[in-house]
Regions:
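Buried hydrophobic packing residues in well-ordered domains
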Residues: 16, 35-37, 57, 70, ...
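Scaffold signal of the M16-like zinc-metallopeptidase fold and its non-catalytic homologs
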Residues: 44, 82, 89, 114-164, ...
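An aromatic/glycine/proline-enriched structural segment found at the starts
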Residues: 139, 168-230
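M16/MPP (pitrilysin/insulinase) zinc-metallopeptidase core fold and M16-derived inactive scaffolds
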Residues: 15-81, 116, 136-140
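Acidic/histidine-enriched alpha-helical segments
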Residues: 50, 54-59, 94-112, 123, ...
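Mature N-terminal segment immediately following signal peptide/propeptide cleavage
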Residues: 1-15
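Short beta-strands and strand-coil junctions in structured, solvent-facing domains, enriched
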Residues: 21-25, 92, 96-97, 177-178, ...
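M16/insulysin-pitrilysin zinc metalloprotease superfamily fold
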Residues: 43-48, 72-106
Length: 230
């Protein structure tokens, strides 16, 4: 945890990140599970449904988001409550059945469009040219793989990848390091890592041969060139 005291205004901003790499951590056959999980954090927690959770945030005029990157911005007087809500959402998301079905469908539709986009196809062509066969980055999320993911797999992925030993929290604002530590330990202190620490570092990339790829884009008004040297 990093704390920077700043008395400029009576506010506190909390930003955190859980180090992860979905290319390495996603189980085989579950491509898309990370994207579905990310879309479910806005549906409340195990103790507060979506509307109740949003009301709790509105009551203290806080802006909050949860996921592998998480944050809350709040007035100093509501700092403890803001961190409490953030921790509840981050560690105990509701992951409800009905919301899962909605988010899964939305994710599948989004992926279907993304796979056809010139930007994605250009990026994919570069990856195929630069990376060896079997490289984790070459794993591809498809509408079919998204539709195969189950809610239990989403819950298991959350439990396996959200770990305190891979998390950094930065707090900036009208708060001392001692105050910040007390609050964070109160609401995040019970968070424990379970199982071996996952590998989040991609393998080294071997030398590759020169190559070129052409990606068509019917809507482009001119050609563009993307050089890539590795």
């Amino acid at each position: 945890m990093i704390v920077k005291t700043d008395r400029t205004s009576p506010t506190v901003s909390v930003a955190g990140a859980v180090k992860h790499n979905s290319d390495l951590e996603t189980p085989a056959g579950e491509e898309g599970v990370s994207e579905i999980l990310d879309g479910l954090f806005s549906y409340g927690t195990k103790t507060l449904d979506r509307l109740a959770f949003q009301k709790a945030l509105d009551d203290i005029a806080a802006n909050e988001s949860a996921g592998f990157s998480f944050s809350v911005n709040v007035l100093k007087e509501h700092f403890p409550r803001g961190v409490e809500l953030l921790a509840d959402n981050e560690l105990h998301p509701a992951l409800p059945d009905k919301a899962f079905a909605v988010v899964q469908h939305q994710t599948a539709d989004y992926v279907a469009g993304e796979l056809q986009s010139p930007g994605y196809r250009t990026s994919r062509a570069l990856d195929l040219a630069l990376l060896p066969a079997g490289d984790p980055v070459l794993r591809q999320t498809t509408p079919a793989s998204v539709k195969k993911v189950t809610l239990d797999e989403v819950k298991q992925y959350h439990a396996a990848t959200f770990r305190p030993d891979l998390t950094t929290i930065v707090i900036i604002g009208d708060v001392t390091p001692e105050e910040a530590r007390t609050v964070v330990e109160k609401w995040f202190g019970a968070w424990k890592a379970v199982g071996p620490r996952p590998d989040t570092t991609l393998p080294a990339i071997p030398r590759n041969k020169p190559s070129a790829a052409n990606v068509s884009d019917a809507e482009a008004v001119q050609d563009s060139v993307t050089p890539y040297i590795l």
